[in-house]
């Protein structure tokens, strides 16, 4: 989910 890559969005 988005939560799994939430910090990769930075």
From Swiss-Prot:
CC per GO annotation: extracellular region
Keyword hit for Signal: no
Superkingdom of origin organism: Eukaryota
Disulphide bridges, residue numbers: none
Residues annotated with Phenylalanine amide modification: 10
Localisation per UniProt entry: Secreted
Keyword ATP-binding assigned: no
Record keywords: Amidation, Neuropeptide, Secreted
Family according to the record: Belongs to the FARP (FMRFamide related peptide) family.
Function: Muscle inhibiting agent. Involved in the neural control of the visceral muscles of the heart, accessory glands and oviduct. May be involved in the regulation of saliva secretion.
The protein's name: SchistoFLRFamide
Organism of derivation: Locusta migratoria
């Amino acid at each position: 989910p988005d939560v799994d890559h939430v910090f990769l969005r930075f």
